[in-house]
Amino acid sequence: MLIILAACQSQAASALSPTNTPTPNPTTQPTVTSTPTPTASPSPSATPAPTLFPLPALDPQATLAPCEKRRPAADDLLAEVSDNYGLDPNYVPGDLVKLGNYLPGRVTLPDMLLRQPAAQALGKMVKAMLADGLAPTVLSSYRSYFDQAVAHNRWLVEDPANANEISALPGHSEHQLGTVVDFGSPEIPGLTGSTTAPFSPLFDQTSEGRWLAKHAFEYGFSMSSPPGAQLLTGLAYEPWHYRYVGVEMATYLHASGLYLDQYLFKVRPVMPCLP
C-alpha cells in the first residue's frame, strides 16, 4: 500500500468591486510579501503490510534448520508449507482427532483425521452448510508424509507432465499439518462429465464451492491456492482446498484479498527454513 502525503496550499484572491464611494487617497505603500517557496512533497514510500497477527519469532542471525527437519509448534496455525518450504518427514501433529466425532457419516469417512481446533471449526461450518440445503463432502484431510508420497507417485504415473502442479511433493503438502480439508460436491460430475474425477477447478461453480468462497472465513478457513497463487504455492488453482488458520486471520485474508503464503511473504523477516 502506498501512502502519499501531499501538502495542499489554498490561495485566496480578493477583488474590489467598483462603487459610487470615492476612493480614498493611498496611504503607505503596502509591503510586498514574497511568495513562499513550496515545500516538495515527500516521495511515496511503500508501507509494509501490518503484522496484525503474531508469527513465531525468527532470529535473522540464527542458523536456519533445513526444512526436512522442521516441526511447527503446536500453537502455530500459520506454518508455511509450499513448493519451497517443507516439513520433517516424521512430523505428526499431536492433537489429531477423528472427523467421525464432529461430522455426519454422509459427509466424510469417520476415520479421517484433523487437528482438534480445525475439526471443531469444520463441524460448525459443515452444520451451517447442511442447514442451507447443501451437500458437502470431505474427501481428504490429514495426510502423513508417506500418504502424500503414495498420492504423488500415483499422479506421476497418471499425468507425469503435470504431476508436481497437481500434487505436492511429500513433505511439501499442507495436508501434513492436519489443518487442511479438500471438499467435494455432488454437482461435480454434472459439470465435468466424469464420475471418477472428484477434484476440478469447476468446484468454484458448485453450490458448495460458492458457499465456501463466501462464508469459509467466518469459521476460520481460507483457500490456500486461489487463482494466480502458483508462483508462491507451486500448485495450480485448487478451489476445493481450504486450510484452517483461525477466524481472525481468515477474516483478514478475506478482506484484504490475500492468501496465506502471500501474507507470509510480505511480513516474514527471514525464511522459515532452508529449502
Q: What is each stretch, according to the model?
A:
Residues 4-7:
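C-terminal motif of bacterial Sec signal peptides marking the signal peptidase cleavage site
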Residues 9-12, 16-17, 22-25, 29-141, ...:
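Extracytoplasmic cell-surface/polysaccharide-interacting catalytic and binding patches
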